[in-house]
Amino acid sequence: MRGLARAGLLALLVVSLTLTLLTGAEIARQPLLRPVIARTADEITAATDRMMAREATPDRIATRLTALLADQPHNWIALQAVRDVATERGLTLPAPVQTAYDAAWETDSGYIAQAGSCLTCVWDAGTCSLSQALICQAPVSLTPIGDVAGIARAGVAYAAGTEIDEIDLALSIVGLSATALVVVSGGSSTTVKLGAGLAKLARKMNLLSPRLIAMITDSLRAGVNLASLPTVRSTDDLALVVKADALAPLALLSTDLGRMNDALGPTQSLHLLRYIDDGTDARLMANAAEALKSRTLGRIEILGKSRLLRATLRWSDEVYALFAGFAGLIASLSSLIASLAHSFATRTLRRLA
């Protein structure tokens, strides 16, 4: 009877090992089977709702607002986002925090309006801060009208041997080449153009992170023949000096920034750009923005970048199958070892008796 039981355990061990190896081999063989995959919009919303239920406490919100009010100049995009979290959760701010918030808004909005800064913002949003744009209700528009000029300036600079504005050039090329680049980015040409325009405006407002600037520069140097720029007179000429495959990371980045802009609008998207360091950040942030809409800002202020972006991902079903296989393997092996140990102990005791 014990022999039959051990045979059964051994068979279970073999089956568990086989299933585990097959699942692992399938994940390794299929490039589309990844251990971590993107959550759906509903899953992102549910995951962040659970996190906010734990983290967005009255003390946490008051502490975050106090810290933001201590910064100079005030970041009113972030301040209003955290204030909206309190409203969403039906929380009343402590009187000192509410008083400080109202006083800061009164001071900043009055000063900016009286100083004439709003006129500048309305004329060109790129010359003012995001807080000024919010207070002045200035329209933040994205236009590819400067793309041709950006490429022309770079061509003249290269011919003259002077410094090229590589960021402006890279984003101008993406904006003008959007139709060709949608093949490698998977987005629409309009989305690519909007994303490139958003990044250009962010650069003008000094909102791009150093790592993102480095990524854009690397893509330009790998994907564009700078020596041929002075000969570019049309989009057809531009296609001859651009390597679409090498510009794929920049096209993907622009697509995701365009998605974020579609979900949130330019002002809120520009605020989130400070958290984006590479293409992966942009993709996950765009996923969050499409799922959460305007609530994205409040969640990133309370949860932080890392936790918000992690909430957009989950383990794939294949990984759960692999874990289940491992668990079965360990359980079977443990049972087999226990059975063998029991048999050995029984035989030993009988001999000693």
What are these regions (language model features)?
Residues 6-24:
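Hydrophobic membrane-insertion alpha-helices, especially the h-region
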Residues 16-18, 79, 332, 339:
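Small-residue hotspots
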Residues 2-5, 103, 112-162, 170-174, ...:
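Compositionally biased, low-complexity segments of secreted and virulence-associated proteins
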Residues 34-103:
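Alpha-helical protein-protein interaction scaffolds
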Residues 23-48, 194-198:
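Alpha-helical transmembrane signal-anchor/signal-peptide segments
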Residues 18-21, 35-39, 105-111, 177:
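Short, mixed-charge, low-aromatic patches
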